[in-house]
């Protein structure tokens, strides 16, 4: 599921200003964002890194396209860290949310395992 947003930019507004105003999305940050952010910093032990960050491109004419990085991996020489999440809301079933996250992470794991085997 996604909600495409398109717009004709106002001349004195840069695309990155719009991205900044839209980030983080309520789907990954909660709403309203300030109380949600405080709760996350209190209870969430993991640094989200680039998870749910806007990724995309823009050019000198003001054209561009961005997405929210809902699944990602941070690869270093020493380790690989995968990021995925589930939309936990009132009434969510924790077991189903965990299963959803597991399915998302497995989709990321396959290509990394395949490339590691080639390097051996």
Language-model features: where?
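Cytosolic ligand/metal-binding cores
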Residues: 1, 76-120
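Flexible loop/turn segments at secondary-structure boundaries
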Residues: 25-28, 57-58, 89-91
């Amino acid at each position: 599921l996604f909600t495409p947003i398109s717009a004709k930019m106002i001349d004195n507004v840069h695309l990155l200003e719009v991205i900044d105003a839209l980030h983080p999305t309520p789907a990954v940050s909660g709403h309203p964002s300030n109380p949600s952010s405080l709760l996350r910093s209190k209870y969430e032990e993991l640094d989200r890194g680039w998870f749910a960050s806007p990724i995309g491109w823009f050019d000198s004419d003001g054209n561009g396209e961005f997405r929210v990085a809902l699944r990602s991996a941070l690869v270093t020489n020493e380790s690989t860290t995968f990021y995925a999440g589930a939309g936990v809301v009132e009434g969510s079933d924790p077991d189903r949310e965990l299963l959803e996250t597991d399915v998302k992470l497995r989709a990321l794991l396959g290509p990394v395992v395949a490339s590691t085997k080639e390097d051996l």
